Amino acid sequence: MPTDLHAWNALLRHHDTLRDAQMRDWFDREGAQRVAQCSLEAAGLYLDYSKNRITPQTMSLLMQLAAEAGVTRRRDAMFAGEHINTTEDRAVLHVALRAPAGAAFKVDGEAVVPAIHQVLARMRDFSARVRSGAWKGATGERITDVINIGIGGSDLGPRMVCRALSHLADADGHAAPRMHFVSNVDGTDLAETLVRLDPQRTLVIVCSKTFTTLETMANARSARAWFVASGVAEQDLAKHFVAVSTNTEAVREFGIDPANMFEFWDWIGGRFSLWSSVGLSITLAVGFDAFSDLLAGGHAMDEHFRTAPLERNMPVILGMLGVWYRNFWNLPTSCMAPYSTSLELFPAFLQQLEMESNGKSVQLDGQRIRTHTSPVVWGTAGTNGQHAYFQQIHQGSQVVPVDFVAPLVPPRRLPGHHAKLLANCFAQAEALMRGRSADELRASGLKDEVRIAHMVFDGNRPSNTLLMEDLTPNVLGALIALYEHRTFVQGVVWRINSFDQWGVELGKILARPIEAELTGTATGQHDASTAALIARARAVLKAGAAS
């Protein structure tokens, strides 16, 4: 149990000494020295973690905890291709996907980098053909729209990257196709996408590891029916469909030529898969060179994580700060606030990455864990969040650690805008740390004590600030890899498997017979609430079918 470790118990005692300490006092005493001690750069990212409820002793104890928990040993096992995903008996080697051609990564004794780069070469050639107009639809039309059909890791990661790098869509001189992402089995998602498109100019990527994912295959079948209804012959569907999968036979049975299938491997978890052929949509959206730079940025962060000492290791520092707040301050949520509209989907991506990885209550040895694991992760882009939930972050009864992320140069420039954006980002972090006291309000001339009470900001609320010079594919890759490794570090400390997701399985199993009940006459065994919901829905569905 992590709670049995010496450093864990030392941190419990240390936490008691900091309960009433104020960050503003530390800044008043230490000034620039504190910032120098609590900041570092790696792979194009600058991290300032000085606005945290930490002292040098805190960080020393957190690094001791990381060492005692085996972060270094577990990290090295991951990079060595060991089967650290124990419940599925698989290696976890997404880091190999972004390694250069000469790198040596093996799974079960087999070198995997050559196969990875063969797939990358196919992705490069295919994306070049589509973006240049050489790939034609059934009637010889150029492809102007691409739909990525997938869910979870087959959607969130590629969608986030395509949004973040949309300013580079035409950077290689080609007119990029418009990108559309469909994930929800709710037919509205697909229908509202198709209604805007010309089937003769549309290409569909069906993205599913097993090619059996319920939502993805339902949407894929409906998309195929749309093409056929528009006059595209079955034999011509190959010009409008490609697959990203590990299941060649299922791809063939669906009607997609296996020659148009881009493979990946079962040692890649869905939420870590955007670096693989799952990122095919990224190559179509911004070009293969940008995708290659994304991989290089991720690899740069991998090398930092693999080689930097714990106390100067950015993923380790962020991971251990997360443990500090979750387990010693008992804070149940954390907020991601990117001050960049281009990064507006990053909080949703991070939500899946952290909560699906570390939302566990059982240790690797099968024992129930005796402490908290993943916080609830949420957030939106700034400055929008300031006019929604920042009231709670500043004055609510629950402290919420915040990660601010901002590019110093905007992807798209309008005079005067970016200075305002950055000013708000830095001001929010400062206000969270420093707060505003009753005495300061009185000194400003306020005399109404009731109003003063409402205007007091306690401050002492923690945040990290991550800056990048500008939002390039390279630095975006580093940012994503940073949070991947941060999540991994926390999972090691909690002694959980961050690479399975059994919690999503039971609902899928129960949904199958319920669907049959909704569309037929069968009646299953359910609790009274679920039975009543099924009966109500079935009555409405039958009435609609009869009308």
From Swiss-Prot:
Biological process terms in GO annotation: gluconeogenesis; glucose 6-phosphate metabolic process; glycolytic process
Covalent S-S links between cysteines: none
Catalytic residues (UniProt): 356 (proton donor), 387, 508
Keywords of this entry: Cytoplasm, Gluconeogenesis, Glycolysis, Isomerase
An annotated Gene Ontology molecular function: glucose-6-phosphate isomerase activity
GO CC annotation, single: cytosol
Family matches, as HAMAP family: G6P_isomerase
UniProt record similarity statement: Belongs to the GPI family.
Protein name: Glucose-6-phosphate isomerase
